[in-house]
Amino acid sequence: MKIVIQRVKSASVSIDGKIKEKINQGFLLLVGVEDADSNFDLDYAVRKIAQMRIFSDEADKMNLSVQDIQGEILSISQFTLYAETKKGNRPSFSAAGKPDFAKAMYEKFNDSLAQIVPVKAGVFGADMQVELINDGPVTIILDTKEARKNA
């Protein structure tokens, strides 16, 4: 899994011009799945995201997690994180997970994360418009492939 984690003051996702979901302070996640992903990747990502301390404490040090601040998460499926751009000018997305597998993993990821932190989500495969107010900005890229190699 590749996940872009953005610390936000607020975020929303709209479909057909109507807001589907919105959150206040927390994380906007852009979530990509590849066919090699497994429950290991899912569990690793959930644990890392729930415990990642990138919110400032009273000393202005990044020391608080999304749980600590009672924040929320807006999760958006994003197969384009697996774009391959080596050849030509049009990206290839063949490295992205097959739609049925990716959808199941994405939904399981959201369900697992929602047991720890409030999670709202976009619609898998839909054409969505995402608005956010970055906080910092703080943007982290989590790639579970590295953890899988070392497991």
From Swiss-Prot:
Domain remarks in the Swiss-Prot or TrEMBL record: A Gly-cisPro motif from one monomer fits into the active site of the other monomer to allow specific chiral rejection of L-amino acids.
GO molecular function: D-tyrosyl-tRNA(Tyr) deacylase activity; Gly-tRNA(Ala) deacylase activity; Ser(Gly)-tRNA(Ala) hydrolase activity; tRNA binding
Record-linked HAMAP family: Deacylase_Dtd
Family to which this protein belongs: Belongs to the DTD family.
Pfam families: Tyr_Deacylase
Motif annotated as Gly-cisPro motif, important for rejection of L-amino acids, chain positions: 136-137
Alphabetical GO biological process terms: D-amino acid catabolic process
Annotated compartments: Cytoplasm
Catalytic activity: glycyl-tRNA(Ala) + H2O = tRNA(Ala) + glycine + H(+); a D-aminoacyl-tRNA + H2O = a tRNA + a D-alpha-amino acid + H(+)
Matches recorded under Gene3D superfamilies: D-tyrosyl-tRNA(Tyr) deacylase (3.50.80.10)
Top enzyme category: hydrolase
Official protein name in the record: D-aminoacyl-tRNA deacylase
EC number of this enzyme: 3.1.1.96
Species assigned in the record: Lactococcus lactis subsp. cremoris (strain MG1363)
